[in-house]
Structures are given as structure tokens and as C-alpha cells.
Design a protein with these regions (language model features):
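Sequence contexts marking disulfide-bonded cysteines in secreted/extracellular proteins
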Residues: 20-22, 77-79, 98-100, 161-172
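Surface-exposed, charged secondary-structure patches
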Residues: 73-122
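Short, low-complexity N-terminal intrinsically disordered segments enriched in polar/charged residues
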Residues: 21-45, 49
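Mature extracytoplasmic domains of secretory-pathway proteins
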Residues: 112-141
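Short, well-ordered alpha-helical segments enriched in acidic and aromatic residues
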Residues: 43-65
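Low-complexity, intrinsically disordered terminal/linker segments enriched in charged
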Residues: 133-190
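A mature extracytoplasmic/lumenal domain signature
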Residues: 59, 101-105, 136-139
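Bacterial Sec-dependent N-terminal signal peptides
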Residues: 1-31
């Protein structure tokens, strides 16, 4: 075999080795993203099952988020959150998954707005365990106007109901009542 053919074979072998290594790495990344997506799905299913024990089992390592997410689950349950659409999860990187969920609820219903809110859960997942969760929402401006109105005009509705960390049901129901009063007392066309 000539030196030229040996060189070509060596180069082809090296290229094949490099390409195969790259594919293995991509498969590992894909498996990690699939795993994170599965973990996110398990969390969302537990949250909207309104079963506290199921939710807690997904929050074992989310020490800083656990209490607020359990409170929020109870708020959502008592506010009659109904999932309208589970949007595609957004894999931001190897540890952050965004889970946008569109819901219909009593709060927006009390404001008589034809709008469904999308709540987004920002899950940080490391080593296949949820480490923290943050939430965001696209609540309309009217939602915040109504909350502000309650604070200034009917504080007695929510002060006691919302003072504790274990009163999510009382708080959301009082807020809905306040939103109804806000709507009845506000003559502005929405």
C-alpha cells in the first residue's frame, strides 16, 4: 500500500472517530433534556392534581421553593384553576426548563375579562432533581389594578385572610370577592 493511501486511510479513520465522539455527546445532551422534560412533566402533573403529597414528592430537593409552591398549589386549587392548554416546555439550557401553562380561574372570571392567564414555572433541575422553582404570569394590568383597589378600599377583605402562610384558600376567595366588588364599583369600561 502506498504512503498516500495509508495517509488517506489514517485521515478517514480519524474523521470517523471524531464524528462518532461528537454524536455520543449530542445523544447525552438529548437524553439529559428528555429527562429534564420528563421531570418537568411529573411536576406539572403533580401540581395540577391538587394533591399536596404528590407535589411534595417532586420538591424533595427544592428547599427554598417548596413552601411557596405548596401554597401556590392550594391557591390554584381554591381559585378553581383549570388547565386550558399545556404549552410546549422550553428547554433553556441543561438545567432550566420553562413550563408555560394556560389556565382559566375565578380571579380573572371575577373581573369579567375574556382572557386566560399563562402561568410559567421556571424549574431548575440538576442531577435529575428539581432544585428550585420560580413562577411568572402574564396577568393583565386590570388584575393588578383590582389588587391595588382592594388594598386601598377594602383592606379588611384580605388583611386577615392573607396574613398567614397556611391560608391560601381563604386568601384567594377573599381576593375573588374583592375583585367582584372592584368590578361593581368601577364604572370604567374594560
Amino acid at each position: 500500500m502506498s504512503e498516500f493511501k495509508k495517509s488517506i486511510l489514517l485521515i478517514c479513520g480519524l474523521l470517523l472517530h471524531i464524528v462518532s465522539c461528537k454524536n455520543v455527546s449530542n445523544k447525552e445532551d438529548d437524553m439529559n433534556q428528555t429527562s429534564n422534560s420528563d421531570i418537568a412533566t411529573e411536576f406539572i402533573n403533580a401540581f395540577y392534581s391538587f394533591n399536596k403529597d404528590s407535589l411534595q414528592s417532586t420538591l424533595t430537593y427544592a428547599d427554598d421553593s417548596r413552601h411557596s409552591i405548596i401554597y401556590y398549589q392550594k391557591w390554584a386549587e381554591c381559585g378553581n384553576y383549570k388547565v386550558i392548554k399545556q404549552n410546549d416546555f422550553i428547554i433553556k439550557n441543561d438545567s432550566l426548563v420553562l413550563c408555560p401553562i394556560t389556565v382559566k380561574d375565578d380571579l380573572i372570571g371575577a373581573l369579567e375579562v375574556d382572557f386566560n392567564v399563562t402561568d410559567t414555572f421556571h424549574l431548575t433541575i440538576i442531577n435529575e432533581k428539581i432544585q428550585s422553582i420560580e413562577t411568572s404570569s402574564n396577568d393583565p394590568d386590570l388584575f393588578y389594578e383590582a389588587k391595588d383597589w382592594i388594598k386601598h378600599n377594602k383592606p379588611e377583605l384580605t388583611e386577615k385572610a392573607c396574613e398567614g402562610t397556611s391560608t391560601a384558600c381563604e386568601c384567594v376567595k377573599a381576593t375573588v370577592e374583592g375583585f367582584i366588588e372592584f368590578k361593581a364599583n368601577n364604572t370604567t369600561k374594560f
